[in-house]
């Protein structure tokens, strides 16, 4: 008879090796591929950091804000700004900043599960979530190169951890701890509400989910929702933080003359609605890298098939399972998180279909919530059934990881390497333009940003 503890440790060692390997792969991709996958958004933030460095102003006068308004001390922008004092290489500063933010995200994933699960299996939960997040899909550019959407997950995790401690029944026994927790909650919700996107997909769904859970807890008696001092205080602080954040955002946008805001988002007409729906479905498959015009019997074809299975589990099976499974519970944090995530996902999908905000990048928050649901779903299967189910789950994850990273090396890293070799041998377009004094006349505004940074 095989030893159960030995089999258990082998399974966990295999999963641990896959997680560590995935983390090292992400570090390599960030350091090696960022320059090859550089785009105008990254150029904008680096140019802003350079202007901040030279002017000594966090919001330089006359700077053209096209991608967004950075918030002091709570974005990777401040890390790049500080690194510029010791490093002159713009892109390297950006890469180091993204590595720091990514490490912070991984740490918060572990802290989140240790807080809400509080058992040894929290490490297993964190490992599976990190493993799924590191799978090479179309979310990579926004997550690990631009770093634009990592902060959404970071702020959500911080908010959930603080909220969990606030809702613990023992929290009001220590007055100082209570004040600090509510102050932390106010600050986090305030800064989230200073971004219209975060207000719509995080702050508002969060407060709405809290009120809905409270409504259920009092057996659907509306007049009893605010019967406790904690509920009244929590609601007042929440709406105050959201309102102040909303006002502060527009005040800041006006101060820096932001060229475009989410206020420019409009509803689409009936003639465009069906096209938006088709675009949304296409974006979902694209985001999970579940579509590709390639041979079925190739590493890319196999990876595409595996990604389709992941899409089905992540986007359909696990969210529905979570709603059914945790919806039956009463007063649990995971029930609250499920309701919050469903409301947030619904709003994102609604805006992607019924408004002009149909870019695939908006799907990132839905993708993130589905990773959490998938982790909980897989752990449930592993715990409910015998060890052989655990072996099947871990082996499937490891196969997906190996195929995904191998395909990424072939389809993305290899062409970037060829690009670097060609640039080393033949020079770059920027070098040619500078050698011939052609410093103006770039093809477009975005290319001007891109080329200027890459020429540094």
Q: PLM ranges: what are they?
A:
Residues 11-22, 176, 180-184, 236-240, ...:
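Signature aromatic-anchored transmembrane alpha helix within multi-pass, membrane-resident enzymes
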Residues 20-24, 96-120, 158, 316-321:
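Transmembrane-helix motifs of polytopic, lipid-linked glycan transferases
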Residues 32-40, 53-81, 91-92:
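Membrane-proximal lumenal/periplasmic loop motifs of glycosylation machinery
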Residues 69, 73, 120-167, 358-370, ...:
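Membrane-interface micro-motifs in multi-pass membrane enzymes
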Residues 148-155, 201, 302-314, 334-386:
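Hydrophobic/aromatic-rich transmembrane helices and adjacent perimembrane loops
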Residues 177-207, 240, 244:
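Membrane-interface alpha helices of multi-pass inner-membrane proteins
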Residues 210-215, 300-332:
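Hydrophobic, aromatic-rich transmembrane alpha-helices
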Residues 434-456:
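Short periplasmic/luminal acceptor-recognition loop of GT-C membrane glycosyltransferases, typified by
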């Amino acid at each position: 008879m095989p030893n159960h503890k030995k089999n258990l440790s082998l399974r966990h060692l295999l999963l641990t090796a896959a997680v560590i390997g995935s983390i090292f792969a992400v570090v390599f991709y960030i350091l090696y591929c960022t320059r090859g996958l550089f785009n105008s958004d990254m150029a904008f933030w680096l140019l802003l950091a350079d202007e901040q460095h030279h002017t000594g102003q966090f919001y330089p006068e006359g700077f053209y804000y096209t991608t967004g308004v950075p918030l002091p001390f709570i974005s990777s922008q401040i890390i790049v700004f500080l690194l510029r004092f010791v490093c002159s290489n713009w892109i390297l500063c950006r890469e180091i900043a993204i590595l720091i933010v990514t490490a912070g995200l991984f740490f918060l994933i572990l802290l989140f599960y240790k807080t809400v699960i509080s058992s040894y299996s929290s490490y297993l939960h964190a490992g599976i979530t990190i493993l799924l997040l590191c799978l090479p899909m179309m979310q990579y550019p926004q997550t690990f190169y631009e770093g634009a959407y990592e902060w959404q997950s970071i702020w959500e995790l911080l908010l959930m951890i603080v909220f969990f401690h606030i809702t613990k029944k023992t929290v009001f026994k220590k007055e100082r701890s209570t004040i600090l927790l509510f102050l932390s909650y106010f600050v986090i919700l305030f800064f989230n509400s200073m971004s219209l996107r975060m207000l719509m997909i995080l702050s508002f769904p969060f407060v709405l989910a809290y009120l809905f859970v409270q409504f259920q807890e009092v057996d659907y008696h509306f007049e009893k929702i605010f019967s406790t001092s904690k509920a009244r205080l929590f609601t007042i602080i929440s709406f105050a933080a959201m309102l102040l954040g909303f006002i502060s955002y527009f005040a800041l946008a006006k101060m820096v003359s932001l060229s475009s805001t989410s206020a420019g988002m409009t509803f689409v007409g009936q003639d465009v609605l069906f096209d938006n729906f088709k675009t949304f479905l296409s974006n979902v498959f694209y985001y999970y890298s579940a579509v590709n015009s390639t041979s079925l019997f190739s590493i890319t074809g196999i990876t595409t098939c595996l990604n389709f299975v992941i899409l089905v589990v992540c986007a359909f099976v696990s969210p529905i399972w979570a709603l059914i499974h945790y919806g039956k519970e009463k007063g649990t944090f995971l029930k609250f998180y499920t309701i919050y995530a469903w409301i947030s996902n619904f709003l994102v999908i609604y805006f992607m279909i019924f408004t002009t905000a149909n870019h695939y990048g908006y799907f990132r928050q839905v993708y993130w919530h589905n990773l959490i649901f998938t982790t909980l779903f897989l752990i449930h299967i592993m715990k409910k059934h015998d060890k052989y189910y655990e072996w099947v789950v871990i082996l499937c994850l490891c196969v997906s990881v190996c195929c995904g990273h191998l395909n990424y090396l072939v389809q993305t890293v290899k062409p970037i390497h060829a690009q670097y070799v060609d640039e080393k041998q033949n020079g770059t377009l920027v070098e040619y333009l500078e050698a011939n004094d052609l410093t103006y006349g770039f093809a477009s505004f975005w290319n001007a940003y891109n080329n200027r940074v890459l020429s540094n």
